[in-house]
Amino acid sequence: MKRVFDDYDYERIYDKQLDLSTGELLEEVVRPQRGVAYTTATIKSGNQFEVEIYPSFRHQIPDMIRRHKEKKRESRECQKNLNDRHAKKKLFRLIHENFYPGDYWCTFTFADDPKDLETAEKLCKNFFRRINRVRKKKGLENAKYVYIIEESERLHLHLVMDNGLSKQEVESKWGLGFSHIQTLNYYKDENFIGICEYMMKEKKDIRLKGKKRWGSSKGNLVLPKPSKNRTKLSKKKVMDMVLNQDSIGERLEREYPNYNFKEVEIRYNDWNGLFYIYARMQSKKWNRAFKRP
């Protein structure tokens, strides 16, 4: 089997969003390329199914990509956008893979506003330790959770957590301010899309340089891994999808008949005329009453 080179940060390379409102753009962007194919990576998280289609190379990663990786540091805004895209995908996958209807969607505030993000993180981690001590006494494993510390007028904590303890038990272990716990559920035939979007919405914050805005429990969450197929879609099929975006949903539903198409985004790079396609689909067979195993 011929070796294929597709191990690179394609989201960094294909960073311009494609707008097909005019045909002139495609004429400027598309360039014929030899030695190029497309890898299809799929990621299943709960009832969500992501499809990522990106260029692979039959000989080696082109010099232009290596130079792009080695060139001077990206602008702060470009790097922030890339980091945000990676973070959103990881959070999306963790939540959909590890949480179920009946789990908890929580908001906690601080009566005494922490002086900085680092202090807030320490207080939150102490809260998780208190939760786990109660669970241990009950013979339960450590809590599963994904959280984000957010600043609007004041710092506060948003949290998705499993329902091993009652809402009253969880609230009693916060003790630092107001608490509001809702039962996690689906909304309008989606899974937890709204929760993910809310947690990762754009907002001014006081993140320290290099710090994540969100975190999760350690050692008990499953992060779905991509499954690669290097022959699923030919270059011709990919270009047809780019040129006929209205047909992408129908085409993907033929390729993956157990899923309904939901949304797509196409990005490109203007120096090599190649494309990256991201699509989200949702299982047709997902049972709303499905509970934690």
Residue ranges with predicted function:
Residues 1-153, 163-293:
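Right-hand nucleic-acid polymerase module
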